[in-house]
Structure formats: C-alpha cells, structure tokens
C-alpha cells in the first residue's frame, strides 16, 4: 500500500485548517491542537517543520502564532509532503540515484521513474485552496442530506392516525 506517514497526514490537516481561517488571525499551537484534535507536541513539531520550509510564518509575542506564508492557492500538497517527508517518489531509487545495487540491471526502474513523476506532478497540481474547496462542498452536501432526512414536525407516519 502506498500512503503518507501519519505526521505528513497531520501536517496537511493543519495546513488546510490554517488556510480556512482569516489571514489576520494567527494560530497558536495550542489552539490548533484543540481545533484539530491533534496532540499538542505533534502540532508543535509540525508547525516548526512547516515554518522552517517557509510554508508557515511564525509571529512571536502576545498576539503571536502561525499564518500561511503565502496564499492558499499557491501552496501545493507536494510542497507540504516535501517539507515533512522529503522528495516524492514511487520508489527510493526513483528519487535518489545509486541507492540500489540492482539499479543498472533493474527491469522496472524506468517505469518507477515514470510513476514517480506522475505522482509528483499530480500532487503539485493540488493546492490548499483545492483541498478546502472540496471540504466545503462535502460539508454542504452533508448538511443538505441531513436537512432532507428530517421530517416536518406536523407530519404523520403513513398508516398511523
């Protein structure tokens, strides 16, 4: 199974959460931990890493906290993964040459490179704005389904009088 590690998943959740909030409101590690239900030490670690990679900007002081370093539409999922996991690739050898003893005789290396490039390209085309747009659409759909499932207070079940 190909998947992100848990910290990267949490990092994407944090970045999407920060992107949904007003830009002028800095987020503290504690407020983000409370709002996302993630452990405070994990949130602190992720905020530091994301700041070091200039995806978040940090502000010290009484009104300090974290904000996006750029607009949500210019931060890609690929950048977040790169900041938290390193280079994106399908296999280790498709990212760093010379790691595998079979590299020169490998029958699938070129295909691994093609898959890695396609994966990276796809992730470079999904932004925080895209993630939040999809989330807002899902929340609206859920709300509409919930409203549709509620029967009016004056309705009588069929066959009961």
Give the role of each language-model region.
Residues 97-161:
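C-terminal regulatory/oligomerization modules of transcriptional regulators
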Residues 54-69:
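Beta-hairpin "wing" of winged helix-turn-helix
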Residues 34, 51-52:
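Alpha-helical residues within the helix-turn-helix
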Residues 12-23:
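Short amphipathic alpha-helical interface segments
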Residues 27-37:
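A short alpha-helical element within helix-turn-helix/winged-helix DNA-binding domains
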